[in-house]
Amino acid sequence: MPSKKVAKEPKSVSDGARVLEQLKAENIRWVELFYTDVFGGYNQVDVPLASLDEESFVSGVPKLDGSSVRGFREIFESDMLLVPDIRTLATIPWNPGAGGTVRFICDVRIGGTKAPYDHDPRWVARRTEQVLADAGFDHSYWGPEIEFWVFDSVQLVPSFQGVHDAWAGAGYQINHSEAPWQVGASQPPIRFKEGYHRTAPTDSLVGLRAEMCNILADQFHVVMDAHHHEVATASQSEINVRYDELVPMGDHIQDVRYVIKNVAHQHGKVGCLMPKPVYGDNAIGMHTNQSLWTKDKNAFYDANDKYAEVSQTCRYYVGGLMKHSRALCAITNPTTNSYRRLVPGYEAPVFIAWSRANRSASIRIPAYHRGRPTVKRVEYRTPDSAANIYLTEAALALAGLDGIKKKIEPPAPVNENIYKLSPERRRELEIRELPGSLGEALDCLDSDHAFLRPAFAPSLIETYIELKREEQLELNLRPHPYEFYRYLDV
């Protein structure tokens, strides 16, 4: 893999001047400044190119009210800065009416001091890169496999307002031409769990995914690996991005999510990253591949290991992931809906175990090839596409690093279908279960977060848990339509 320097705070005034001259020469009129909130949402403010100068790329643009962003600042301390990262320059292709438009991803700084803001997920990721470097790992490489849906339409019935009514709830209706429940479709449907690698015309999204990937490559400079239909019906898809280091990969995945939603919208469809919208079929995940490197050597590879060609460092890293897996779920699986995915029978992890080439384990060592150190990696299969990618990568890296520092030896790998093991056999193999709800995951994070402290501020963890508990409570307080079906006659 190519050698890269650890990502540091970018830029100089001269770099900013060069970029501004380039944009002026291209007749760019508007600049979109993007940043990520605590829960992974992309946010933007648009400014005229003429309002920026060279200093904007060093000192920041004063266009952020931190009190208006969930999980950021209080109203009495809310002046914040957006510092554009010139390495993230991209062209926005769907704003022709605005003239030429470009985008920069920004770091968030505190107004007055210009200090990095420790609730900025991108800063947490950048800090984690430094923690890894301090531990002797010059590079870490990441390859999340992002899955998603593109529905023809989604309605809440009778309306979105119904979810807030005290006297009436809202049902939902998903429409897609591939779905077996769709009336009047022109093609045979994709039956539940029979969508994997289907071809056109059964796969109705080949062209749409290609358009997404082309835009990502051409306008957002993201190197693509593959795209395909996934297992579930009703449009379930996957896009694979070429591996990259921690912060750049976070940027890439944010852009993938953004492009999915916007290209779908351009075609009158709904791009969706909700893990489990379709009952009875597979949900979407975000299996996250990762490896640590010292100079140009993969620290996870050992040619002498007969089981999976993994080093002792890799085993300790896996041990750290396994020790903290239940706490990690609060970050890697951050919604109440996430736990409708983590159930038996739908190819999603339920039990904490590691193995070679075993997709029933939560941690898999891919075994496509032997004797190839550059591709040796750990695949952590628990995350889903609703997760904040910066915090997910950072938390996984810190959990694994904790395992390395403390020499946490994982249990023996499990070379059986874990879904079919008896409870007694699972206990014998020291297999624990992942949390069954967001509330349970938050309890685990509340009691196990010391491993995150090298990069996660205590206030960030406290804020995250507090606001996520509010989400869980909001759902728990509301009667569910299925409860009326099940209990109206009790």
Residue ranges of predicted features:
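Glycine-rich, acidic/polar active-site loops that bind/position phosphate-bearing ligands
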Residues: 2-490
